[in-house]
């Protein structure tokens, strides 16, 4: 399998997308596939650039043995040519990412933009809810959803040529 380049995107890049990045990195490390993937995360907004993931999300992930290594950054046009897939957490993220990508036109070689939940195997959610303004349970629920979706994504990528 050729190296796959995956970018996870949410609003501020401090809760959902760094959690998705961390979960996916955890899964590929467990399978010994680190050399087959480039994984990153970004936000559609730039408010938190340079900051680590939200402390509550980091704590919830650490309880599952998942490390969240990234620092917040904002998605940029170069990401559409640097990554194979861009996975968004909700409809607003999807709409904003697609709008940004339209600036590059419809040329070949651009990243495929998809909702993260399209890879869920057990959950029927249509979006990954933002836990930022909620309590501890919201962070746990997001991690449950992301573990499901990241597992489905990995299965799909390993099956594709």
Residue ranges: model-predicted function:
Residues 82-85, 91-161:
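Phosphate-binding/catalytic loops
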């Amino acid at each position: 399998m050729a190296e796959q380049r995956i970018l996870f995107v949410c609003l501020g890049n401090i809760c959902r997308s760094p959690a998705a990045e961390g979960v996916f990195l955890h899964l590929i490390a467990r399978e010994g596939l680190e050399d087959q993937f480039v994984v990153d995360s970004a936000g559609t907004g730039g408010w938190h650039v340079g900051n680590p993931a939200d402390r509550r999300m980091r704590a919830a992930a650490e309880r599952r043995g998942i490390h969240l290594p990234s620092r917040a950054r904002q998605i940029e046009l170069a990401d559409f040519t640097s990554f194979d897939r861009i996975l968004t957490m909700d409809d607003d993220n999807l709409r904003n990412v697609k709008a940004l990508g339209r600036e590059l036109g419809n040329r070949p070689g651009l990243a495929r933009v998809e909702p993260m939940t399209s890879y869920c195997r057990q959950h029927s959610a249509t979006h990954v809810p933002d836990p930022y303004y909620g309590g501890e349970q919201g962070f746990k629920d997001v991690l449950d959803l992301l573990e499901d979706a990241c597992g489905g994504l990995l299965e799909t990528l390993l099956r594709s040529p």
